[in-house]
Amino acid sequence: MNYIKILLSLALVILLNVQLSLAQQNEENFTVLGNCGMCKKRIEKAALEAGAKTAVWSQETKKITVVFDSKKVELATIKKNIAAAGHDSDEFRADDKVYESLHECCMYGRLDESKDPSDTELSENTDDGHDHDHDHEVTGVVVNESERGDLTPIAGVNVYWKGNEKNITTTNENGVFKIMHEKGLRFLVFSHADMTLDTVEVKNLHEVLMVSAKNNVLGEVVVSRRQKSNYISSLSPHRVEILTSKELFKAACCDLSESFETNASVDVVSSDAVTGSKQIQMLGLSGIYSQLTVENLPGPRGFAAPLGLNSIAGTWIESINISKGIGSVANGFENMSGQINVELKKPHNSEPLFFNVYANNMGRTDFNLNLAQKINHKWSVGLLLHDNFMYNKNMNFSDNGFRDMPIGNTFSGINRWHYENGKGIIAQFGVKYLLDDRTGGQKEFNINSDKLTTNSYGLGFRNERVEGFAKIGYVFPTNKHRSIGLQLSASNYNQASYFGLNSYDNEQTNAYANLLFQDIIGSVTHKYKVGASMQFDKYDENLARVSDYQYTIQRNEAVTGVFAEYTFSPTENFDAVLGIRQDYNNLYGWFTTPRAVLRYQPGESTTFRISSGRGQRTANIFAENLGIFASSRSITSLNSLVTGANAYELAPEVSWNTGFTVDQQFSLFGRESGISVELFHNNFQNQVVVDYENPRTVSFYNLAGKSFSNSLQAEWQFMPAPHLEARMAYRLLDVKTDFESGRLSKPLTAKHRGFMNLGYNLHSGWGFDYTLNIVGDKRLPSTAINPIAYQLPEKSNAYVTMNAQISKSFGKNKNFDIYIGGENLTNYFQKDPILAFDDPFGSYFDTNMLWGPLTGRMFYTGIRYHIK
């Protein structure tokens, strides 16, 4: 708690200093989206007409600086007038009809209405682009500027490259032209019967040119920006890394578990050597400590968490938002190491049709179909389908007789609806369904004759999940800052599974509601959110072993609470977010969740953030550790766990997370570059310790001592050449827990990791991506008391994996893609993933010692087709 007090004191000191320094200032800087010089004229004119004394909009940064008298005009009035002119700002969105009436050149890239324009990183492509080895089309607009400063397009202007007068194009009725670049040529010539011939140097092929004719003299204004495939918003108080669909297309990304292959922030590892389930790791902690949400509604959690990553298809995803450390109190109390929020494709702004088919040489096939239809100006409907087949039961790289991946089928789908009446009401609702049915174990296992016998070792699971969800919001027409929203979801998850002679079945019924109201106090300098939430879970478990034991465990857990969050934003350079929750758990009583975030941006290129707060969750020890059933380990004090009060007679897990990050942008090789450094410390007040240190048993007990994780990550992004993007990262982890046998590093967790991703994309449609991962050695749980044949070393080997993909887009609209790729091209895989595989029903059989890749080199291919 001491460092929380220090943090809050620091926040207060900074707040007072900032407030005093700005007391006499009436200058504001905020984001306004636009494209060209005509946009600049329109934006500045709208600001001045609204009462601003001066207004300067930057085409490069997409920001406007206004000076005004706050006693005479409010900043919100200026922003509203800019939006009325057709330009989205960080708070007000232009009317669709006004936007659509803008000039062709002014059609800037709009954001989804549910997002804040300030959350979009508008990044400049600063390379000159003249040394291309491929065809490139230059786009521009020719306009006439009157004495009043009004801009009107000029049609019929001849445009050609100096040095090749034969290749001539002409501006259309909107003054827009497009001409193919020819290598070595840098100057465009413009000619028209009513103006003097002139030549303009094209400084950057990637940028849209605006050529202005004033008094028969031509000049050029450069305006173009593009969005990166992944970026961090410098304006958001919370540090959120956003992975766009462009980033996801760098790899096959069949489902969510494969969507982080080109990212250094999140690790995805196999949970064990036989079930095929995967889990994420953030800040060195298991995925159970990070919060997975889908459009800010709870994602697969509780019993569904271990297999939940497979339930969301990669082609459904619009973007993934990764937030390390603590999150907003409005999203709940369970977040301890970070939050991953998945934004799915929405019917009102998605392509009408998207189809993807994927196949690899290991026998896996995936089909994906996305459909969207606008019924009328209020209603839209979408359908997202995913089907995954795996029927190669002979895949066994380690040659131990066990299938590396279970065979079977996974089907999932979403039907969703969107309603918007144009008067402030927005509603979304739909249903989700998942069915996952798979069988694994030894290659000769036959489910009809060998299930739950010693004839042959087998395992299987059938998971079914149904969810209904709704989001209803109302934005007050007279005050766009004031809104009220209601989030609802209900789900049922059912799992039936067996592992050799063990069986484990569970069922979870969940209901969730979150009511949120947000507004400002006087001005946007002071914002607040208040709300109330309810979460109910009904858990039923049945675990048994043939001729040994059978237990039934039931519990109902309900958590209700209220929350409040205040944001102080005196300028775009500073934010302070202070939040608190008060919840009541029917099993554990009252608890408080305080959280705080500070963001300070001393300049446009540097951003500092500090965060700290508390998280709490209830452990589901059996569902979260399915691998214990796929081994011969006995569960220590099993009877006490299954008959104990509350949840397994264990206390809730509680931790405090503190983080510091810095993001620095700069220019390198004449192009954009950036370095980020992250430091996070997580300290558990209580943790349910999962102890594998005795190779014959597994123990679950409350922490008696300390458990902590320290994470340091540094990442460098740069462009060494035109169209070539590079990212390099290094991460250092120090994760330790006081076990009954003493303080030890977390097993199966690499202390060191190196990462590199290269992406080379051409306008001709070719894309090349390469990812390198260097994983350091990992501590292995002790096997010292096993017979020598079944003993493992104290540490694993370090290893290197490489992935690569080549893609090509075809068609006039680039709407047909073919991609081929390979994963684990180094062909490194663990030679002994299953301990005592030769005696699966003996005393030393264990599938939980997986520290490296389970399978070797894999190749895949696929196609994508969409209609815009």
Question: Where in this protein do the model-derived segments appear?
Answer:
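Flexible loop and strand-edge segments within Gram-negative outer membrane beta-barrel domains
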Residues: M390-S412, H418-I484, A490-Q508
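Short, acidic, small-residue-rich periplasmic hinge/interaction motif at the N-terminus
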Residues: A155-K162, S191-D194, L205-F249, G287
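Extracytoplasmic beta-strand/coil segments of soluble accessory domains associated
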Residues: S257-R301
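C-terminal beta-signal and adjacent terminal beta-strands/loops
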Residues: Q616, Q685, I774-T783, K808-K868
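Short acidic/polar hinge/loop motifs at secondary-structure boundaries
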Residues: F177-M180, Q279, L297-K324, G413
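Membrane-embedded beta-barrel scaffold of Gram-negative outer-membrane proteins
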Residues: G485-S497, Q601, R609, Y648-N702, ...
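Gram-negative outer-membrane beta-barrel transporters
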Residues: E678-F684, N702-T783
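N-terminal periplasmic accessory domains that precede
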Residues: L205-V211, L256-S259, K278-Q281, L307-A313, ...
